């Protein structure tokens, strides 16, 4: 994307045109996410939770900026090593410490703290939250965001915090409850 390529504008009105939801419900959903920093959308499979979550993020960002939205899907084998960091085998033998998708996205959001970033987790109920988030589980709460609540990571003793400009949208199927 060059400096001359403008991203498509995406507003609350665009969201209402694209997603089958009442204006009052959109306002409530948007306000709740901005205040709490975390929400879970639930519904039957195939109703458009992923579509809605991405568009909710774009409507808050104000444009369809895919660089500020990360999407992953949990499963029963998803782990802290995939999500935050862990040792992975190298092709030439041995192991190396690799940072996970959540760690990298948090760092990206921290380096651009005046913008909002959205981390969308599909099938959030299929993963073991304690196993995946580890010591970061507390840090996703709104009251524990930011540098003043940083903690030391298990694998490398690095201090880490979940940035205040990161919003998490989890999704789950009601059939899985």
Feature annotation, model-predicted:
Residues 1-5:
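Extracellular interaction modules
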Residues 6-177:
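AAA+ P-loop NTPase catalytic core and its hallmark functional loops
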């Amino acid at each position: 994307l060059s400096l001359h390529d403008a991203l498509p504008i995406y507003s609350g009105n665009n969201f209402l045109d694209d997603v089958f939801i009442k204006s009052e419900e959109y306002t409530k959903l948007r306000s709740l996410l901005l205040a709490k920093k975390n929400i879970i959308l639930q519904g039957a499979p195939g109703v458009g939770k992923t579509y809605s979550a991405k568009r909710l993020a774009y409507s808050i960002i104000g444009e369809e900026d895919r660089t500020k939205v990360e999407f992953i899907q949990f499963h029963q084998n998803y782990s802290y090593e995939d999500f935050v960091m862990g040792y992975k085998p190298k092709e030439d033998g041995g192991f190396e410490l690799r940072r996970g998708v959540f760690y990298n996205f948090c760092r990206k959001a921290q380096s651009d703290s005046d913008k909002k970033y959205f981390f969308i987790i599909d099938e959030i109920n299929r993963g073991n939250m304690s196993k995946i988030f580890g010591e970061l589980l507390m840090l996703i709460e709104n009251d524990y965001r930011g540098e003043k609540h940083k903690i030391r990571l298990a694998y490398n003793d690095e201090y880490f915090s979940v940035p205040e400009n990161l919003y998490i949208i989890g999704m789950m199927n009601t059939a899985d409850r």
